[in-house]
Amino acid sequence: MLRYRLYFVGLYLCALLYIAAGINHFVNAEMYLRTMPPYLPAHEALVALSGVIEIVLGVALVLRPKTRLRVWAAWGIVLLLIAVFPANIQTYLNMKATADPRLTFALVRLPLQLPLIAWAWAYTRLMPQRPKSR
């Protein structure tokens, strides 16, 4: 029973993280614009699009958590995290070039992408069976 409950607690926390992050793309768009690699076009549109995608994927994780929708949403989050990794690298490079005091945070953020990917990936599989009541 505990494993089943933890599965859903983690699922809802994961969804909340991505919904909040997506909303933050609109509330603090300037922060995300600074992380955009210069080789990408339409920075404003890409920041807004990634915010919408994070919100949609977060909602999809919990909208019907016992269906394939959750699986597809989790795979979407995994792919999104891989896709935005260059922006995390760009943030580090920008901060390194300007001796930004947040450089250490930007450096630590890079390997933190792996546990976030693993967390989302955990929801790409079938959920554990609910234990039968005694």
Predicted regions and their residues:
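Membrane-interface extramembranous regions
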Residues: 1-134
